[in-house]
């Protein structure tokens, strides 16, 4: 176009194979990821659609296509565009919380012959931690949700951080400043 802000594809003879109406066209192996108006699609090298336009960031890796949805969930498709997993979890971590108990760590001192000469305690106490009831899972990089001990998803991945503040109490941060306190049932 005249603004030169849209992209298309032409063949070796200069014929338009894909009109210049896309915000971006990214080749990957024998595919193209095309972007238009905040949506993306995957096309074959013959420009046949594998995935229709969707509000997602799409990437191709190995033998699959991963879609990062606007709600921070991940979906996985095969290279024929068939949905393999509609809720992909990239990582699961246990959560630890500080108890009321504190500990002082000590270091033992020995002489050259290996005889104990004394112990020194660190000045700063360390809070004793225990494992919380729930776990946190990660979908899109940096977005977390709560998961039950048995692996059931409790909340969608709408938090930028989750910290256990008790055995079954969690501070779920929606940004650097705001958050909400939830229990293991997500309320």
Residue ranges and their predicted role:
Residues 1-187:
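Residue-level detector of conserved, function-critical positions
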């Amino acid at each position: 176009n005249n603004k030169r802000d849209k992209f298309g594809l032409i063949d070796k003879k200069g014929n338009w194979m894909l009109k210049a109406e896309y915000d971006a066209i990214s080749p990957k192996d024998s595919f193209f990821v095309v972007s238009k108006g905040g949506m993306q699609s995957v096309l074959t090298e013959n420009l046949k659609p594998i995935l229709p336009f969707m509000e997602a960031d799409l990437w191709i890796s190995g033998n699959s296509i991963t879609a990062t949805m606007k709600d921070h969930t991940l979906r996985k498709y095969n290279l024929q565009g068939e949905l393999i997993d509609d809720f992909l979890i990239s990582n699961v971590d246990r959560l630890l919380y500080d108890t009321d108990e504190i500990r002082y760590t000590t270091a033992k001192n020995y002489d050259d012959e290996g005889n104990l000469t004394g112990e020194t305690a660190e000045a700063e106490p360390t809070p004793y931690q225990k494992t919380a009831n729930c776990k946190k899972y990660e979908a899109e990089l940096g977005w977390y949700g709560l998961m039950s001990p048995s692996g059931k998803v409790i909340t969608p991945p709408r938090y930028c951080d989750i910290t256990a503040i008790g055995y079954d109490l969690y501070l779920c941060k929606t940004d650097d400043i705001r958050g909400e306190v939830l229990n293991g049932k997500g309320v």
